Amino acid sequence: MSEIISVAFETNGKGYLGYLLDLPGAFVRGKTIDQALSKVEQEAIIYQKWRGLRPRYNLKPKVVQIHYSSLMVEDADSEILLDFDKEKMEEKEFNQYIELIKKSGFSILTIYKNTELKNWLDETRRRKTFYGDVPISIQRIFEHIDSVQYYYLSRISTDIEEKKGFLERREYCLKKLKAIYLRENNSKIYITDHEKWTIRKVLRRFIWHDRIHAKSMVKILKKQKWMGLIDCYQDPFNFFT
């Protein structure tokens, strides 16, 4: 018997970006909605392996929301506020998000620290996107992931102090988010730079952003191995294992 997994999509007509509601930060992409939906089960399996869960198979995706956007969705630009993002969040669930973001941070750092050729440039990745030049080395991707941590916090907080170190910045963001959560749960919708945010959306986007760029890091490592530049690499997210 198939198990239903809910998916919410954002599209501009040129590409589709889908979020798996039961798996915070899990996503699929495709030029068409059918192409994206065909990737749901594999994405769910990869995600559950990363979390140390027994993978569920025979999943049937159900589209529960479609948001039409003018953003460059084909480049993973996103603004969607999921209906799920607005729901009440129990403290147990909030803490699960926090632990996932910590785990994701450690996974990113594992890839980065174990990379031998951090500044090796993958010229095939060079192109322009909505946020500028695509980072084409693991060093640049890591720096981009790090810089975005404060961006997500700034969507619902203007009181931000600079901290040193990737994990230190992450821990600071999570403490600030917890303080906001304890004050208002997930009851408030913030509008920042014309985009709607809630605490749950910030938490979800933290994990999603880690995963989408970690996948690029591992793709570069996979290419380095194929070219004989390295013997092995770390893939804690299980993207290609």
PLM segments and residue spans:
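Short, charged, surface-exposed hinge/linker loops at domain edges
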Residues: S2-I4, I45-F94
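Short, contiguous alpha-helical
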Residues: V7-G15, L23-R29, K39-R56, W120-L167, ...
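The catalytic Nudix box helix
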Residues: A36
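Short secondary-structure junction/hinge motifs that connect adjacent elements
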Residues: Y57-V64, L121-T124, S187-I189
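A short mid-domain helix/strand-loop element embedded in enzyme catalytic domains
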Residues: A76-K88, I101-R126, F142-Y151
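Acidic/histidine-rich alpha-helical segments that form the ligand environment
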Residues: E87-T115, E161-Y190, W197-S216
